[in-house]
Amino acid sequence: MKIVFMGTPDFSVPVLRRLIEDGYTIAAVVTQPDRPVGRKRVLTPPPVKVEAEKHQIPVLQPEKIRDEAELERLFSFEPDLIVTAAFGQILPNALLEYPKHGCINVHASLLPKYRGGAPIHQAIIDGEKETGITIMYMAEKLDAGDILTQVTVPIADDDHVGSLHNKLSEAGAALLAKTIPPLIKGELQSIPQDDQLATFAPNITREKEEIDWRKEGERIYNQIRGLHPWPVAYTLWNGKPMKIWWAEKVSSPKKEAPGTVIALEENGFLVATGDETALKVTDLQPAGKKRMLARDFLRGAGSQLSVGSVLGGQDGS
């Protein structure tokens, strides 16, 4: 049986690697084009391309998978099954209908919850205690195909996008390994999604990154870890954005205005929120500076920060 694998970021790599380890013939890998990365805009291949080339697997990098010429190239590999994991483009119907065993997708949520491009971020931001992996048939509508298998993955209180991403990626690879054999034998019964239960996790926008200190401390904490290590939550200090890489929840009976610095400690500073849960900022990045520990910030660039200083807007927003 020949498989074409379609994926792009780090999340996709363990999935591809597991297919290779399980002995499937990977006829080709389809991924996004190389993109400029970093301040120096260095042209960088997607992680999936790097992994595929280690195993001498042909790599296709179409700008638009819907282009007729790109589809013909893909059809030339005659896949019996197409597996996608965070590919980044919606597949056209002509491609969905081509493989004998269909096109299946590894999605990082328990569908129909969190359809879209940022399900890991959004689950943490929303304070979920669990999420999971769904393997489903693909449809032209985003993340709306019939469900084949699912597995639940708990979210710890100190999980962030990076740690949960790694858990889900490995869980996705393991679930796929269990799903393919009964799928190709015709032993799996798919289940349609209930669109009325669907929630959405669109890509993160700049507006979602700014901290509103008027919110409850728990919600801000979830926002910080739901944006770590990318794109990172931020607040304003002296009118300039300061990234908040990490913070800890601290019970505080003080009733200072949200955004007010209420204490300086050896390893961080406490900021008032909209309730009695303050946040101790321990890891940050001032505008124009490198990421640093809060204790180093307080000794240097942040020496002007004091009890009573206000982060964010004048009202903590």
Swiss-Prot record:
Q: What is its EC number?
A: 2.1.2.9
Q: Known Pfam families for this protein?
A: Formyl_trans_C, Formyl_trans_N
Transmembrane feature ranges:
none
SUPFAM superfamilies, alphabetically?
FMT C-terminal domain-like (SSF50486), Formyltransferase (SSF53328)
CDD domains in the cross-refs: FMT_core_Met-tRNA-FMT_N, Met_tRNA_FMT_C
Q: Which reaction does it catalyse?
A: L-methionyl-tRNA(fMet) + (6R)-10-formyltetrahydrofolate = N-formyl-L-methionyl-tRNA(fMet) + (6S)-5,6,7,8-tetrahydrofolate + H(+)
The UniProt keywords, alphabetically, are: Protein biosynthesis, Transferase
According to its UniProt record, this protein's enzyme class is transferase
Q: Which GO terms describe its cellular component?
A: cytosol
Which positions in this protein are listed as binding (6S)-5,6,7,8-tetrahydrofolate? Answer: S109, L110, L111, P112
Concerning its family, UniProt says: Belongs to the Fmt family.
> What does the protein in this record do?
Attaches a formyl group to the free amino group of methionyl-tRNA(fMet). The formyl group appears to play a dual role in the initiator identity of N-formylmethionyl-tRNA by promoting its recognition by IF2 and preventing the misappropriation of this tRNA by the elongation apparatus.
Name of this protein: Methionyl-tRNA formyltransferase
Organism whose genome encodes this protein? Halalkalibacterium halodurans (strain ATCC BAA-125 / DSM 18197 / FERM 7344 / JCM 9153 / C-125)
Lineage, please?
A: Bacteria, Bacillati, Bacillota, Bacilli, Bacillales
Which gene does this sequence derive from? fmt
